[in-house]
A protein has these predicted regions:
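Conserved small/polar residues in nucleotide/adenosyl-binding loops
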Residues: 222-227
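Conserved N-terminal beta1-alpha1 strand-loop-helix module at the mouth
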Residues: 2-88, 140
C-alpha cells in the first residue's frame, strides 16, 4: 500500500488489536479466530488491524483488506523487551507483508546490547521503505525512536515499564505533549476503554487509535466491568 494512502486511511480512525496469547481462551493452535475478529472489526468501520505472529497476520491479511500493524511477541533471557526484539522477527514480519512493523521502543536494551533507536536505525537501513512503529512509554523514548526513523510512535508501553509503573489510566496530557514534541505520528494505544476516551485522545493530538482489550479480549473487558 502506498504510504500516503495508508496515512490518509488511518488518520483519525480506530485500529483494532486482534491478539490472543497461548494462555487466553480465544487462542487455538491452528488459528482462525483472530481473522474472524478482524472481519467483525472491518465490518464495523475499523481502519486497520494490529496483530501478533506471522500465522495470525497472514490469516488476517487473507480475511480483510485493511492495513496491518504486525508484531511478534517473544521473551528473551536477560531483557524485559518482548515486542519484535530481534532482526529475526523483523525479517519474518517483512516477509509476510506487514504494512506497519511495530517494535518495542522502551529504554531497556535488546539481547545484543542495542538500544531501541539503534535497532530502528538498523531496520530502516535494511528495509528503507518499511513503515515502523515504536511502542514507547515516555516522551524521551518517543523522541529518540522518531529521530532514529520511526514513522509512528505508540503510547503502548506507558504503565508497563519500571519508569511508568502506576500509570494505569490513559494520560491525555502525555499524548498532547508527545504529539507536540515528537516528529513521528502518534498512535494512542493502551488504557482506552470507552468511546469518550478515544475521542479525547484524538483531540489531544493522536493521529490514530489502537484499541484491543475493550473490543477483542472479553476476559480483560469483563474483568474491568466486574471489578
Amino acid at each position: 500500500m502506498d504510504k500516503q494512502v495508508l496515512f490518509d486511511q488511518i488518520k483519525g480512525g480506530l485500529i483494532v488489536s486482534c491478539q490472543a496469547l497461548e494462555h487466553e481462551p480465544l487462542y487455538t493452535k491452528e488459528g482462525g479466530v483472530m481473522p474472524l475478529m478482524a472481519k467483525a472489526a472491518a465490518q464495523s468501520g475499523a481502519v486497520g488491524i494490529r496483530a501478533n505472529t506471522v500465522r495470525d497476520i497472514t490469516q488476517i491479511k487473507e480475511a480483510v483488506d485493511l492495513p496491518v500493524i504486525g508484531i511478534i511477541k517473544k521473551d528473551y533471557e536477560g531483557t524485559p523487551m518482548y515486542i519484535t526484539v530481534t532482526m529475526k522477527e523483523v525479517d519474518e514480519l517483512v516477509a509476510c507483508g506487514v504494512d506497519i512493523l511495530a517494535v518495542q521502543g522502551t529504554s531497556a536494551l535488546r539481547p545484543d546490547g542495542s538500544t531501541a533507536a539503534q535497532f530502528i536505525e538498523a531496520i530502516k537501513a535494511k528495509y528503507p521503505e518499511q513503515l515502523v512503529m515504536a511502542d514507547c512509554a515516555t516522551i524521551e523514548e518517543g523522541i529518540a525512536c522518531a529521530n532514529a526513523g520511526a514513522d509512528f510512535v505508540g503510547t503502548t508501553m506507558r504503565g508497563y515499564t519500571p519508569e511508568t509503573q502506576g500509570c494505569d489510566d490513559i494520560d491525555f496530557g502525555f499524548i498532547h505533549e508527545l504529539s507536540e514534541k515528537c516528529p513521528a505520528k502518534i498512535i494512542a494505544e493502551g488504557h482506552i476503554h470507552y468511546p469518550e476516551q478515544a475521542k479525547k485522545a484524538l483531540e489531544a493530538g493522536a493521529f490514530a487509535l489502537v484499541v484491543g482489550g475493550a473490543i477483542t479480549r472479553p476476559v480483560s473487558y469483563t474483568h474491568l466491568r466486574a471489578h
